[in-house]
Regions:
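RNA pseudouridine synthases
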Residues: 1-161
C-alpha cells in the first residue's frame, strides 16, 4: 500500500542499489557502484489517496521494493526509512465526517504496509513449481476493508481469491 495514485498501470524499474553504510541501514541508488536491481510493478487499484501495488523483484537487494517505489515518487505507507510520512494510518484521516476521540483512536496500520502475499519458485530437487500464499495480516486486512468501504471500491478483492 503506497501513498498516491500512479499514472501508470505497469512500471519497470532498473536502478542499481548500494547499501548506504549509515546507521539507519538504508539502501540508495548508486549508478556507479550499485549492484543491478530490477523490479516490475503493477497497479492493482487506488482508493482515495492510496494505491495497492504488486511488486515483482527480479533481483534480491536489501530494501529493493521500498527504494524503487520511493525513487518513483510512491512511498510505502508507514515506511520509517524511505517516506517523509511514517505516521500511523488512522481512520480519522480517511473518513471526512469522522466523529471520534482522536486521543484514544487506535491506528488502522502502524507498521510498514508491505506484505509478501505470494511467492513462486522451482523446487531444487523435483523441479516442480511451488507457489506459497500468505493471507494479509489482520491490520492490513482491516485497512483494506476500511478503504473499500469508504471509497466504495475494493481493488484487491479479486486478487486475494
Amino acid at each position: 500500500l503506497v501513498h498516491g495514485k500512479p499514472m501508470w498501470d505497469t512500471l519497470h524499474v532498473d536502478l542499481p542499489l548500494l547499501p548506504d553504510g549509515d546507521m539507519r541501514h538504508r539502501t540508495v541508488v548508486n549508478k556507479r557502484f550499485g549492484k543491478p536491481s530490477v523490479t516490475d510493478f503493477r497497479l492493482i487499484g487506488s482508493c482515495g489517496g492510496y494505491s495497492w501495488i504488486e511488486a515483482k523483484p527480479k533481483t534480491g537487494r536489501t530494501h529493493q521494493i521500498r527504494v524503487h517505489l520511493a525513487e518513483n515518487g510512491f512511498s510505502i505507507v508507514c515506511d520509517p526509512l524511505y517516506s517523509g510520512n511514517q505516521k500511523p494510518l488512522r481512520l480519522s484521516e480517511l473518513k471526512r465526517n469522522w466523529h471520534g476521540d482522536e486521543d484514544s483512536e487506535k491506528p488502522l496500520l502502524s507498521r510498514l504496509a508491505l506484505h509478501a502475499y505470494k511467492i513462486s519458485f522451482t523446487h531444487p530437487k523435483t523441479g516442480e513449481c511451488l507457489t506459497l500464499c500468505a493471507p494479509y495480516p489482520k491490520d492490513m486486512e482491516a485497512t483494506r476493508k476500511q478503504l473499500a468501504k469508504i471509497f466504495k471500491v475494493d481493488p484487491i478483492e479479486d486478487e486475494t481469491e
